[in-house]
Amino acid sequence: MHMKSFKIAIDGPAGSGKSTISKKLSQKLGWNHVDTGAMFRALTLYLLENEVSWHHEKSLNQALDKINLSYSCNKIFLNQEDVSLKIKSLDVEKHVSSVALIPAVRTKLLKLQKEICGNTPNLIMDGRDIGTVVMPDANLKIFLTANITKRALRKQQEDAQKGKITDIAQIMKQLKERDHKDYHRQLAPLSKALDAILLDTTELSIDEVIAKIIALIDKKRRT
């Protein structure tokens, strides 16, 4: 298989390490990386900054027409502005899961994600429905998982880096609620593609997970 046609779908629940691993894997390989969660956060940022109510269908649809998202050098741009840092705000984090449930939002972003898949060589895309919906023809599909305690600890460490002190029990409660939403939503629920390889990252370091994925890429490219 020629390298330029190689596409990897990485899915998993919140805190499974998919974004961190995808980003570092792309840096190691020199490939393109698209974090679809960042796309939802960028769209949420626009709605918050422009005081658009996502519960009001007409206002939301008008706003969606004005939103242009693009990726360049693994950074996300909202209407030509690099918002890679702004989308990590606590306000965006608080609202993104609600915005992500809206069918019109998912439809807009799915169209964009599929366009990116078609136009981008050497692509690593991570999210919750990449292997099942966005890129079902990916050359390699990975589903990352980890136990809830480990995922909560990772989230707590992320929060600490943002200067936010959080309670581990509260994070575990939030993760369980998020899992329930993600697995049971009607539109593109979180699920492992039948041909995806399950990787439990609970006891693995980032480098160990990346080494396993690179071995899987090599194996795929030999077949």
Curated annotation (Swiss-Prot):
One Gene Ontology biological process: nucleobase-containing small molecule interconversion
GO molecular function: ATP binding; CMP kinase activity; dCMP kinase activity
Example of a GO cellular component annotation carried by this entry: cytosol
Binding-site positions, ATP: 12-20
UniProt keywords, alphabetically: ATP-binding, Cytoplasm, Kinase, Nucleotide-binding, Transferase
Catalytic activity: CMP + ATP = CDP + ADP; dCMP + ATP = dCDP + ADP
Protein EC: 2.7.4.25
Pfam families, sorted: Cytidylate_kin
Signal peptide boundaries: none
Cell compartment(s), UniProt: Cytoplasm
Tagged with keyword Transferase: yes
PANTHER family: CYTIDYLATE KINASE, CYTIDYLATE KINASE/PANTOATE-BETA-ALANINE LIGASE
Protein name in UniProt: Cytidylate kinase
Origin organism lineage: Bacteria, Bacillati, Mycoplasmatota, Mollicutes, Acholeplasmatales
UniProt gene name: cmk
